[in-house]
Regions:
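Active-site beta->alpha loop and helix N-cap motifs at the rims of alpha/beta catalytic domains
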Residues: 1-87, 93-104
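Catalytic alpha/beta core domains of metabolic enzymes, predominantly
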Residues: 66, 71-168
């Protein structure tokens, strides 16, 4: 659920009420909760303190199965946010989005490894290709990460029409 599209996301009671409604409607289906900040391609900005409060509300609700925590805006707070989610029994997707380019393979692997070392259950990268070679760069990084850390599943995607093959 993309909470950045929820108008009352900053209202703790409204957010908790909405999460309980989603949990009831979904039954046994998994609920992934995401607040995608504007800096990472989302609907609205959210200060770091507000983002942490959002994560706390999600964790306290007992409704989420997975929580997506953004990597770069929260890098210093990441281990604490992940520990909070894990203490609540919530798996963590740690995400990074680059809408301008595809960084080199080594940087992509470094990012995913840093996410894993911070405690993320599922590192996630979404990057923008400028060429077919960029798509292959992401796929090579994905292969290297899964070879180095087979215990950690990863989510990677190359965006746009050019990256479609990476999203099969």
């Amino acid at each position: 659920w993309r909470a950045d599209w929820f108008d009352a996301v900053s209202d703790v009671n409204a957010l908790a009420h909405c999460l309980h409604g989603l949990r009831a409607a979904l039954g046994e289906k998994l609920l992934l909760v995401t607040f995608r900040t504007q800096a990472e391609g989302g609907e609205k900005p959210l200060a770091q303190e507000e983002y942490a409060a959002f994560c706390t509300t999600v964790c306290a609700s007992g409704c989420a199965d997975l929580l997506d925590i953004e990597f770069f805006p929260n890098r210093k707070a990441l281990p604490a946010l992940i520990a909070q989610a894990h203490a609540a029994g919530i798996a963590v997707v740690c995400s990074s989005h680059d809408f301008e380019k595809t960084p080199p393979k080594e940087e992509l692997v470094r990012r995913m490894t840093a996410m894993q070392q911070a405690g993320a259950d599922l590192p996630k990268l979404a990057v923008m290709p400028r060429s077919r070679a960029d798509v292959l760069e992401l796929l090579a990084a994905t292969a290297e990460m899964t070879d180095l850390h087979p215990e950690t599943p990863v989510i990677t995607m190359s965006m746009g029409a050019l990256g479609g093959v990476s999203r099969l």
